[in-house]
Amino acid sequence: METPFSQSWHWQAIDPSRNVARAYDLWIETDLFGWTTIERRWGRIGTKGRAVTTSYPDRATADVIAKEIRTRRESAIKRIGVRYRAVV
């Protein structure tokens, strides 16, 4: 559930002919201490994958980092040959 203090994005890149089935999730939330955290999870669909959580002292900094991450997902077609699509 998203609150005014949280946002999330979910993407998948699927191409059976290239054996590509990737998922990428991004969450921005405010923790109990007022810091903004960015949690990223990625990996092959159906696996545990990897996760990284990073904390920032303010929301503005976290928003800049999140925008950079979203921009990188948009460039996947150049890197892996398959475009990430938003999953609702």
Regions found by a protein language model. Give the residues of each.
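A generic structural signal for ordered alpha-helices
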Residues: 4-7, 16, 40, 44-47, ...
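Short aromatic-glycine-(Arg/Gly/Cys) micro-motifs in beta-strand/loop hairpins
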Residues: 25-53, 67
